[in-house]
Structures are given as C-alpha cells and as structure tokens.
Amino acid sequence: MRRFTLTAALVLLAGLSGLSGHGAEKTKLTELMQRKLVNAQKVLAAVATNDFKAIRKHAEELIDISKEAEFKVLKTPRYELLAEDFRRAAGELVQSAKDRNVDGASLAYVQMSLSCFKCHKHVREVRMARAD
C-alpha cells in the first residue's frame, strides 16, 4: 500500500512539471495540485484504516479543489470529461464513506487515481503537440 502511495505521489508530482503557466498562475496551479496530492494521500490513509469521517472530509476537499477556476489546466473537451470523471469518483468516495462501505471507497479511490493518471497523460500529450 505504501508503495502505491509513493508511486501515485511521484506520478502526480511529475505531472506538475508538464503544466504551463506564468508567474502567479503557475504558482496557484502548483499550490492547487499539491493540495490535491495531500488530500489524495489522506484519503488513501483513511481508506486503509476505515476512517470514514476522514475519507469524506478529504474527498469533499478534492471535489472543491477541482472546481476552483484556476484549476482549469486545458480547455479541451477531453480535459473537461476527465475532470468530471475525477469529481464523480471523489463523489463516490463521499457516498461510500456515508454508507461506511470500505470496499466501495477502495474502488472509488482506485477510479479517482486512474482519472488523475489519464488526465496528466492527456495534459502532457496536448502540451507536446502544441510545442511541435
């Protein structure tokens, strides 16, 4: 489990380097991504310990972070779809916490993580295509 957390953290942090922005915009985006990573790690710890209150709290925080206007990295239909997938999975985490369903929370966490990986891949691909 710890290895998965470390891997997820490295992937998310690696994605930060592919994000564009200038000055305050880049700083704000980096801060939001770091908050997202911290909360995702806290959700994982809460799922592992059946701490449903913490699952709900940090999943709700992740939803709020994803809705912040500055969080919009790209204006593509695919990005919007991936962002919605992330919020849906985080919402499933909230519901699983309310239901005290650790299996549902575990699955929702994996789905949320996959949405992060897919989104970071999409952002890198779009950035590389624009750089060409």
Which ranges hold each PLM region?
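Sequence context surrounding c-type heme c attachment/ligation sites in exported
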Residues: 22-132
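Bacterial N-terminal signal peptides that target proteins for export
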Residues: 1-9
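Enrichment for repetitive, rod-forming helical segments
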Residues: 9-10, 43
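Hydrophobic h-region of N-terminal signal peptides that target proteins for export
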Residues: 11-20
